[in-house]
Amino acid sequence: MISFNVPPTVGKEMTYIEEAIRSHKICGDGEFTQKCSKWIEENTGTAKALLTTSCTHATELAAILANIRPGDEVIMPSYTFVSTADAFVLRGAKVIFVDIRPDTMNIDENLIEDAVTHKTRAIVPVHYAGVACEMDKICDIAREYNLMVIEDAAQAMMATYKGQALGTFGDYGCYSFHETKNYSMGEGGALLIKDSGNIMKAEIIREKGTNRSQFFRGEIDKYTWVEAGSSYLPSELNAAYLWAQLDKADEIYNDRMESWNLYYSLLAELSEKGIIGLPVIPDGCAHNAHMFYIKVKDLNERSELIHFLKGKNIKSVFHYIPLHSSPAGKRLGKFHGTDKYTTVESERLLRLPMYYGLGEDKIIYITEMIKEFFTRIRGY
């Protein structure tokens, strides 16, 4: 069976993990955590990057820093992972879902302003598949209405919009290093902070509400509890694993881009005939090959194709069930306007195997089986 995902390994993971163990410091904020944070800062230009135990926790930390409170409203797409909404619902906010663009599956920037009310506190753009939302328009709206922008860039590290790293446009940006992401630490994430004036508070909340980070830098002679916080530090073992990935980030990026481009070229004929849809990369957007998906006619055709590919030992999967259709989404959120594309397009989308080291032979086989399905089984 060709797996849908294989967590990336580059060969130095065990070396660095053993190094962390020998250092006798395997809790958070050790040498490998600092290396990873510095790498993110240098490669994105953000003022500060704090490693976290997940992208979910990075988003929760951003919601706390943004002072999201009960009764506030936060605008986001419904086509996203539950964590995007959870972080704000936990603060008592109501999520306001806005329809997506059918080309990128990102929030439709032209529908955001109409969803703004006196209760709105933040916009949360989600860069689906590492393809940027229209950040110029979104940031303009945020400035006009004095709103925070918190980027869900879980899938978007090493992707850019007009040359600028995703995750660095908003007040805060959130990365994921889950095992399904391009760069992994098993479970983990990072919070990117744009304004250096917010760094100290973020460090305090991340460190159980203490000023422990200042203590370790020698800025104070002891640390104490200074405000409410939580524990969002990953262990050094996780950070050591991630450092192996970041040290080979360009190699991973280039390998995935080769796979993405090969998929696209081999499936272009089906797209040109109108049989399937392929990903759209708007001008000014440079993606990171996080995902390769196709779009088929409808839900039934997708189910048939998944079953067919499984019979050919290929694992393919659909993606999000729109949040507004879920039990929690109906209670805790509201869809603003018309669901013209969110549900329909989500039912068409099928993700194909994509991981570091996938290789040309597997991609050729996968695309041949897709062509066989549409020519022999579906009769196109």
Residue ranges and their predicted role:
Residues Q34-K38, N43-A47, N110, A122-V126, ...:
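PLP-dependent aminotransferase class I/II
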Residues I64-A153, T160:
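PLP-dependent aminotransferase-like
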Residues I26-E73, A87-R91, F97-D99, Q164:
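Phosphate-binding glycine-rich loop
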Residues M1-I26, T224-V226, P353:
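N-terminal "arm"/small-domain region of PLP-dependent enzymes with the aminotransferase-like
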Residues L50, I75, I96, V149-I150, ...:
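Structural detector of well-ordered beta-strand residues that form the stable sheet scaffold
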Residues Y175-S176, G189-D195, W243:
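Short beta-strand-to-turn element immediately C-terminal to the catalytic PLP-Schiff-base lysine
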Residues A58, T80, P353:
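Conserved SAM-binding loop
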Residues E151-M185, Q214-F215, D221-V226:
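Conserved active-site segment immediately N-terminal to the catalytic lysine
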